[in-house]
From Swiss-Prot:
<dbReference type="GO" id="GO:0003924">
    <property type="term" value="F:GTPase activity"/>
</dbReference>
<comment type="similarity">
    <text>Belongs to the SIMIBI class G3E GTPase family. UreG subfamily.</text>
</comment>
<dbReference type="GO" id="GO:0043419">
    <property type="term" value="P:urea catabolic process"/>
</dbReference>
<keyword id="KW-0342">GTP-binding</keyword>
<keyword id="KW-0143">Chaperone</keyword>
<dbReference type="GO" id="GO:0005737">
    <property type="term" value="C:cytoplasm"/>
</dbReference>
<keyword id="KW-0547">Nucleotide-binding</keyword>
<comment type="function">
    <text>Facilitates the functional incorporation of the urease nickel metallocenter. This process requires GTP hydrolysis, probably effectuated by UreG.</text>
</comment>
<dbReference type="InterPro" id="IPR004400">
    <property type="entry name" value="UreG"/>
</dbReference>
<keyword id="KW-0963">Cytoplasm</keyword>
<keyword id="KW-0996">Nickel insertion</keyword>
<dbReference type="Pfam" id="PF02492">
    <property type="entry name" value="cobW"/>
</dbReference>
<dbReference type="InterPro" id="IPR003495">
    <property type="entry name" value="CobW/HypB/UreG_nucleotide-bd"/>
</dbReference>
<dbReference type="InterPro" id="IPR027417">
    <property type="entry name" value="P-loop_NTPase"/>
</dbReference>
<dbReference type="GO" id="GO:0016151">
    <property type="term" value="F:nickel cation binding"/>
</dbReference>
<dbReference type="GO" id="GO:0005525">
    <property type="term" value="F:GTP binding"/>
</dbReference>
<feature type="binding site">
    <location>
        <begin position="14"/>
        <end position="21"/>
    </location>
    <ligand>
        <name>GTP</name>
    </ligand>
</feature>
């Protein structure tokens, strides 16, 4: 029997460039004084996201582990999550008292989902720059994730996207499932995500 605490595992997915790594940096910096955190990043051929988070000082370097998937990023979080599961276990054993581990997927499409063996909760990140039509395109990330983030609201005027249309379509596609707009440059929407993690992840129990 494992003699370490089993942390909450939160999968963070979304297309390339949507802001997954920026979200993790913001969440880590906002939560690290209150909770014991770690991060597993996924990249196909490099450990670029691990490097970005480390250089940004999101957490201590040994709390951030990069996984090189060497293939489809979807496979590494769904069909064969063994490398990620091993990384989660290694971090859990190393620190013993982790409250939460974020698992960031490599950039993927709207159909990407996390194996329930790997993630207890899932956050899916899209961004306004992809166009206001993205929420109504659906896909498991949009409709089934535990929390949806629509990032880069500050870009809406520059790409001709209506936040009102995106809000309407998102509410229609998600029903009662929670979501928020974010502008991570200034921290807009971050507290709502943290509140969700604390509530649904039972971090404060």
């Amino acid at each position: 029997m494992a003699d370490y605490k089993h942390p909450l595992r939160v999968g963070v997915g979304g297309p390339v460039g949507s802001g997954k790594t920026a979200l993790l940096e913001a969440l880590c910096k906002a939560m690290r004084d209150q909770y014991q955190l770690a991060v597993v990043t996924n990249d196909i051929y490099t450990k670029e996201d691990q490097r970005i988070l480390t250089e940004a000082g999101a957490l201590e370097p040994d709390r951030i582990v990069g996984v090189e998937t060497g293939g489809c990023p979807h496979t590494a979080i769904r069909e064969d999550a063994s490398m990620n599961l091993a990384a989660v276990e290694t971090l859990s054993e190393k620190f013993g008292n982790l409250d939460l581990i974020f698992v960031e997927s490599g950039g993927d499409n709207l159909s990407a989902t996390f194996s329930p063996e790997l993630a207890d909760l899932t956050i899916y990140v899209i961004d306004v720059a992809e166009g206001e039509k993205i929420p109504r395109k659906g896909g498991p990330g949009i409709t089934k994730s535990d929390f949806l983030v629509i990032n880069k609201t500050d870009l809406a005027p520059y790409v001709g996207a209506s936040l009102e249309v995106m809000e309407r379509d998102t509410n229609r596609m998600r029903g009662e499932r929670p979501w928020t707009f974010t502008n991570l440059k200034v921290g807009d929407g971050l507290n709502k995500i943290i509140g969700f993690l604390e509530d649904k992840g039972m971090l404060k129990v």
